[in-house]
Amino acid sequence: MTLATAAPIARPCVVCIPARNEEERLPILLASLAGQEGFAAEAPLRVVILANNCTDGTVPAIRALEDAGALASLTLRVIEAALEGAEAHVGTARRMALDAGAAWLEDEGAPDGILLTTDADARLPADWVASNLRALRAADVVGGRLVIDADRAADPRLAELHARIERYWAGVRRLEDILDPPPHDPAPRHGDHTGASLAVPVALYRAVGGLPPLPCGEDNALVSLLRESGARLRHCPDVRVMVSARHQGRVSGGMATEMARRARVLDGEPYLLPEAAHWRTLILRRATLRRAFHLAGSARAEACARLGLGPDACAALETCPNDIAFVERADRILESRSAPARECPLDRALADLDALALSLREAA
């Protein structure tokens, strides 16, 4: 499908991007946004860029693309901000970008519009916006799959490591499908819901108080708030984003930190992940909580008590609108009391996951 033949996007939306010193990568992202299916000069895609604390040519690079006519299918709002002190981080910048996007849609009379966010160093397939909106027909929030946009000259051992790590997380989801399959997020699905690709309606974003302005993990914190409100999170395999494989990033604990960790594995550092038994315990606990929600009166309280939830916790959980919210809120309480997961090297973790899945299937 080409831009000339693509059906126009019916639901109003805006893409919200925090950017700091991204004069090289941001033009690549903007080019991929300008090529999104369903948008054209007469029906442009709204984009907010929060350029924070930039000391390079990030904003001039944007203006150069505009002057060249390369962004005709976009309506751009570039906000320059100088964040200070403890607020000078990606959490504040992403919050400001999303808030600006929400206000834009509300001002245009579209409070039912959709906020999408991605990273300034990402690259998007042409159907990214359309795939998000399709997935939202049966969900409240959509997370996109992260595909590492690796350098072709990178060590092939690194690509093999990426594949093994992905297989580990696919194995965790396979356990979930066997023990407690989520009806709102059926297989096939991925497991990513980060700021590199997230879609949420404006009204729902406002209802949970917006994105927590944390220096790291702001995206996961927002998703937690959404799930605890009862939102159906979909990990649609059709929604994907290419993310940078660079080792030097803007955030400690972000994607660049993970890429640097993986690079060290090639030098002999072990890559440790939770043992399979941890996931089995966690999934079964969440399954028990899900069943408990549908029990009435004292039966629910008794089921919660067996898991270690006292009367006060049970009373607080009475306000949960559905089983999604109940499981997320109750599990947060229980997880805070749990010991850290035991970890083991990647190869053993993979073997244990495969063996556990096989034994569960044979026992079914």
At which residue positions do the language-model features occur?
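N-proximal low-complexity "stem/linker" segments adjacent to membrane-targeting elements
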Residues: 1-43
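Conserved donor NDP-sugar-binding/catalytic core segment of glycosyltransferases
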Residues: 127-164
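Terminal low-complexity segments of carbohydrate-biosynthetic enzymes
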Residues: 261-364
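Acidic donor-binding segment of Leloir-type glycosyltransferases
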Residues: 31-86
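Conserved nucleotide-sugar donor-binding
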Residues: 192-208
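Acidic donor-binding loop at a coil-to-helix junction in glycosyltransferase catalytic cores
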Residues: 216-222, 236
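Short, flexible, basic/aromatic active-site loop/helix in glycosyltransferases
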Residues: 162-190
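Acidic donor-binding/catalytic loop of UDP-sugar-dependent glycosyltransferases
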Residues: 57, 110-134
